């Protein structure tokens, strides 16, 4: 998908830059950042991030700056309207999801409820 199409999930420049850097470190240009939702965490659902070299049937792919973000259909329904970002701060550096669908989140921001 191109940058000028309205997307159900945003992939920020900061996240794309970090993915590009990590892929270069791994020396595997086929890697993509996969974001997914699983049950668990202190709020009911939790975000997960992993590098994957596969795109499965039904996955949505967002390309930015030559790298890809991949989301499975089940996870996408909980992420619509959100943004995958990368932050650096006192608590460390990490990928985060800014999710307008979450009615509450835990203190660390890695789990949420709807």
From Swiss-Prot:
GO molecular function terms attached to this record: 2 iron, 2 sulfur cluster binding; 4 iron, 4 sulfur cluster binding; iron ion binding
UniProt GO BP: iron-sulfur cluster assembly
Keywords: Iron, Iron-sulfur, Metal-binding
GO cellular component, one term: cytosol
Gene3D superfamilies assigned: HesB-like domain
Cofactor: iron-sulfur cluster
Entry-linked InterPro entries: FeS_biogenesis, FeS_cluster_insertion, FeS_cluster_insertion_CS, FeS_cluster_insertion_RrpA, HesB-like_dom_sf
One Pfam short name: Fe-S_biosyn
Binding site for iron-sulfur cluster: 42, 106, 108
NCBIfam families assigned to the protein according to its UniProt record, in alphabetical order: iron-sulfur cluster assembly accessory protein (TIGR00049), PRK13623.1 (NF010147)
Function according to Swiss-Prot or TrEMBL: Required for insertion of 4Fe-4S clusters for at least IspG.
Assigned protein family: Belongs to the HesB/IscA family.
Subunit description: Homodimer.
Protein name from the UniProt record: Iron-sulfur cluster insertion protein ErpA
Native source species: Cronobacter sakazakii (strain ATCC BAA-894) (Enterobacter sakazakii)
Gene behind this protein: erpA
